[in-house]
C-alpha cells in the first residue's frame, strides 16, 4: 500500500462530529460527484477508485439521510486495472444537495457554502474530504516532499488554496492537464496539513522519516566536508613536498634558513601528518599551526623563485 493510500485509509476511519462530517461529505460530492437524469429525476453518482473512500461516502449518506442509495463496482477495461466504485443516490437527490448547500436547482455549485467557510472545524473537515477526493502525497522515504489536491474547477481550486493558507501552509496553485492543482512542498507544511485533517498516525510517520532523512543529509554533508578538507590537506601536502624536493635537487636544503630547513626536513620525513602534528615534530618546536603554515608558504615562494630563474 502506498503512503498516500495509508493516509486516506486512516482518514476514512475517523469519527467526527455530525456537522463536520457533513462538510467532509460536501467536498467528496463536490469533487467526485456527477448529476444524471433517470425517469425525470436527478440521480447522483459519486465515484472513486478507493474502496475505503466509497464505504465512507456510503456510510455518511446513510447516517444523515433516509434515502435509497447503492454501492456499485465497475471493472476498468483500459490501461488502469483498478476497480471503480460508485455510490449512487436515486431518490431525494435535490433535497440532499440543497441541504448540503451545493445545489442551485439544476446543477452542483462550484462554490463552498459559507457555513463551512466560517467554521474552523468544518474547514478542516472539508479539506479532509478534498484530500480524500482528489489528493495525493509522495512517500517521504523515497522522493521529494510533495502533497497536492486536484480539482476540475479553477475557482474551487483557489478556495482550497485559501483554506490551506488560513493555517499558513503556503499553498500554491498550478494548471495541469484538464484541471487545477493546489500543492504543498515543504516537509513541515505537509506534516501540518496531515495533522490539520486528522491523519495523526500518518503525520507521525512522516515526521519520523523526515527527521531521519535530515539526519542522514547532515551526516553526508559533514562527511563530504571532511573529505573535501582531507583532499585539500593532501593536495597542499603534495605541493609542499614537490617544492621541498625541487629545492633539495637544485640548490640543496642547506641553502634555506635554519627555521625553514627544519620544517622542510620534517615535512619530507612525515609526509602524511597535519600542520598541527608537523608543528610538534619540528626540532625547534612545538610550533603553532599558523607558524608552520607561514614557514611552508616561504618555502613555496622560494621554490617558485627557483623555477622562474631556471626558465629565464
UniProtKB/Swiss-Prot annotation:
HAMAP family: HTH_type_WhiA
UniProt DNA-binding residue ranges: 274-308
GO molecular function ontology, one term from the record: DNA binding
Purpose of the protein: Involved in cell division and chromosome segregation.
Protein name: Probable cell division protein WhiA
Alphabetic keyword roster: Cell cycle, Cell division, DNA-binding
Gene: whiA
Classification via Gene3D superfamilies: Homing endonucleases
GO terms for biological process, alphabetical: cell division; regulation of sporulation
Alphabetized PANTHER family for the sequence: CELL DIVISION PROTEIN WHIA-RELATED
Record flagged with keyword DNA-binding: yes
Cysteines paired by S-S bonds: none
Similarity annotation: Belongs to the WhiA family.
The organism of origin for this protein: Levilactobacillus brevis (strain ATCC 367 / BCRC 12310 / CIP 105137 / JCM 1170 / LMG 11437 / NCIMB 947 / NCTC 947)
Domain of life the protein comes from: Bacteria
Amino acid at each position: 500500500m502506498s503512503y498516500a493510500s495509508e493516509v486516506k485509509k486512516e482518514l476514512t476511519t475517523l469519527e467526527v462530529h455530525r456537522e463536520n462530517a457533513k462538510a467532509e461529505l460536501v467536498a467528496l460530492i463536490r469533487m467526485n460527484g456527477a448529476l444524471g437524469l433517470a425517469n425525470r429525476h436527478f440521480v447522483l453518482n459519486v465515484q472513486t477508485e478507493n474502496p475505503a473512500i466509497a464505504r465512507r461516502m456510503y456510510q455518511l449518506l446513510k447516517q444523515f439521510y433516509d434515502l435509497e442509495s447503492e454501492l456499485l463496482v465497475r471493472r476498468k477495461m483500459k490501461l488502469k486495472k483498478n476497480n471503480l466504485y460508485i455510490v449512487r443516490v436515486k431518490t431525494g437527490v435535490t433535497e440532499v444537495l440543497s441541504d448540503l448547500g451545493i445545489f442551485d436547482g439544476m446543477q452542483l455549485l462550484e462554490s463552498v457554502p459559507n457555513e463551512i467557510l466560517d467554521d474552523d472545524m468544518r474547514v478542516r473537515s472539508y479539506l479532509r474530504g478534498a484530500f480524500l477526493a482528489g489528493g495525493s502525497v509522495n512517500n517521504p522515504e523515497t522522493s521529494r516532499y510533495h502533497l497536492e489536491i486536484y480539482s476540475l474547477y479553477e475557482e474551487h481550486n483557489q478556495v482550497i488554496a485559501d483554506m490551506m493558507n488560513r493555517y499558513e501552509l503556503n499553498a500554491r496553485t498550478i494548471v495541469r492537464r484538464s484541471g487545477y492543482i493546489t500543492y504543498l512542498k515543504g516537509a513541515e507544511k505537509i506534516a501540518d496539513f496531515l495533522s490539520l485533517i486528522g491523519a495523526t498516525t500518518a503525520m507521525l510517520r512522516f515526521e519520523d522519516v523526515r527527521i531521519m532523512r535530515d539526519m542522514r543529509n547532515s551526516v553526508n554533508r559533514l562527511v563530504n566536508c571532511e573529505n573535501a578538507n582531507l583532499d585539500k590537506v593532501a593536495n597542499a601536502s603534495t605541493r609542499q613536498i614537490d617544492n621541498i624536493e625541487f629545492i633539495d635537487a637544485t640548490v640543496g636544503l642547506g641553502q634555506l634558513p635554519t627555521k625553514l630547513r627544519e620544517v622542510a626536513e620534517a615535512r619530507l620525513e612525515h609526509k602524511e601528518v597535519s600542520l598541527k602534528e608537523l608543528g610538534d615534530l619540528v626540532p625547534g618546536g612545538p610550533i603553532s599551526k599558523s607558524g608552520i603554515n607561514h614557514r611552508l608558504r616561504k618555502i613555496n615562494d622560494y621554490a617558485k623563485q627557483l623555477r622562474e630563474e631556471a626558465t629565464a
